């Protein structure tokens, strides 16, 4: 669990039923695993991130999308790392993105395919509250 690796974990789930079931599981584990209490969750459209708590040192996206959401890049801290599956619905590559901010405020992104082109993976598609897939926005 990420909660054992970080003081704060923020999780966004768009599927309400899945989020409610997960919340029940967390609550059932709190007595035995108090570190899970540092997980803050919300039901929302993850495309827009969680600006109230930004910037984030790390962002992990767990659904496939054909581009990197600009909102998530804005919420990534300087020298922060994002791991995100990017590509068409037929298969994505998992990118590791490091956000560098220079003294003058200019931003550069260092991108690396963590499998170096050797693997594509199909993730569940990134969806919006309207039900559209992110590539249809």
What are these regions (language model features)?
Residues 87-137:
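Active-site capping/gating segments
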Residues 1-102:
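Conserved nucleotide-cofactor-binding alpha/beta core module
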């Amino acid at each position: 669990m990420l909660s054992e690796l970080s003081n704060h974990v923020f999780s966004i789930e768009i599927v309400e039923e899945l989020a409610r079931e997960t919340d029940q599981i967390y609550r059932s584990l709190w007595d035995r695993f108090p570190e899970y209490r540092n997980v803050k969750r919300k039901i929302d459209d993850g495309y827009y991130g969680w600006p109230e708590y930004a910037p984030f040192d790390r962002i992990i996206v767990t659904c496939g999308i054909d581009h990197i959401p600009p909102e998530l890049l804005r919420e990534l801290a300087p020298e922060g790392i994002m791991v995100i599956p990017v590509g068409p619905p037929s298969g994505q590559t998992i990118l590791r993105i490091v956000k560098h901010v220079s003294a003058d405020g200019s931003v550069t992104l260092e991108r690396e395919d963590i499998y170096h082109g050797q693997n594509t993976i199909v993730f569940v598609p990134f969806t919006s509250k309207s039900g559209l897939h992110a590539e249809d926005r």
